[in-house]
Swiss-Prot record:
Belongs to the eukaryotic ribosomal protein eL27 family. Keywords: Cytoplasm, Nucleus, Ribonucleoprotein, Ribosomal protein. This is Large ribosomal subunit protein eL27A. The gene is rpl2701. The keyword Metal-binding does not apply. There are 2 genes for eL27 in S.pombe. GO terms for cellular component: cytosol; cytosolic large ribosomal subunit; nucleus; preribosome. It is found in: Cytoplasm; Nucleus. One of its GO terms (biological process) is cytoplasmic translation.
Length: 136
């Protein structure tokens, strides 16, 4: 069977606090581990999406509205719905693993790195679909 949930694939979370949020898979673990004995993925997603920006707004207001609030999480495969989209995040691939979640300082440092990467991606104008909220 072909593997659908690969690193770089964009998915939607279907259950829990982040239900309806878009995530990108950073690491897929099919067999499970000791702490999570089921197929799961380490994901990074957008908790708060950037707001709409117009030409008439000033630079300070645009900067404030262009912020992205990310989250990182270990999610069961059953709670992920893959999409046809992919997002290239080369600098995050090896940085965030399942071990990152063991210590709060590592977790917050990883979240800051994800925030920086997401904001760079958003500013470049690429992957606009990923940075818009899902309408349902």
């Amino acid at each position: 069977m072909v593997k659908i949930l690969k690193p770089g694939k964009v998915a939607l979370i279907t259950r829990g606090r982040f239900a309806g949020k878009k995530v990108v898979i950073l690491q897929a673990i099919d067999q499970g581990s000791k702490s999570h004995p089921f197929g799961h993925a380490v994901v990074a997603g957008v908790e708060r999406y950037p707001l709409k920006v117009t030409k008439s707004m000033g630079a300070k207001r645009i900067a404030r509205r262009s912020r992205v609030k990310p989250f990182i999480k270990v999610v069961n495969y059953n709670h992920l719905m893959p999409t046809r989209y992919a997002l290239e995040l080369d600098n995050l691939k090896g940085l965030i693993t399942a071990d990152t979640f063991k210590e709060p300082t590592q977790r917050s440092a990883a979240r800051k790195t994800v925030k920086k990467t997401f904001e760079e991606k958003y500013q470049s104008g690429k992957s606009a679909w990923f940075f818009t909220p899902l309408r349902f």
